[in-house]
Amino acid sequence: MKKIVGALAVFVITYALFSAAGYLFPVDQEWYNSLKKPDWTPSGTAIGIIWAILFALISLSAAIVYAAFSFKGAKSFWFTLLINYVLNQAFSYFQFTQKNLLAASLDCLLVAITAIVLLIIAKKYSRAASYLLLPYFLWSAFATFLSFTINSMNL
């Protein structure tokens, strides 16, 4: 029972932390809407739904690793997740607070790289935890391409 409660707490805390950027660095809709974007840019609503799902998958992956190995038994997973988390939050800061599209794009690339590293590391602890991170990596790779495209269209 203690592991289940701990895993549930890890899920909730991870989800809340990954969701924090939306509150810490709110989107300046007027500025964002003024940017030139490719026709294949998802709507803001779609992006919000996708991130909500991805945050749940990341959180579930973390909860699975925690339930099986706690924090001490999976240090490489937690360290990589922490780095990825900071980079994930930094994207919103660069994009929406600093309005620096190049910095946001470079940061997004680092998010994608750390997402694939996290996926690989997670596989050492749990295949399920690893597979849950695949959509996050794929979306991060797409977001990187989109971010660099938006940056180039607005030079």
UniProtKB/Swiss-Prot annotation:
Q: Name one GO biological process term.
A: tetrapyrrole metabolic process
Q: Please indicate if the UniProt record lists Magnesium as a keyword.
A: no
Report how it sits in the membrane: Multi-pass membrane protein
Instruction: Give its localization.
Output: Cell membrane
| Transmembrane feature ranges | 4-24, 46-66, 77-97, 101-121, 130-150
The record's Gene Ontology cellular component field reads: membrane; plasma membrane
Q: Its principal location?
A: membrane
- Could you confirm whether the keyword NADP appears in this record? no
Keywords (alphabetical) are:
Cell membrane, Membrane, Transmembrane, Transmembrane helix
Q: Which family does it belong to?
A: Belongs to the TspO/BZRP family.
This chain belongs to the protein called Uncharacterized membrane protein YtaB
Source organism per UniProt: Bacillus subtilis (strain 168)
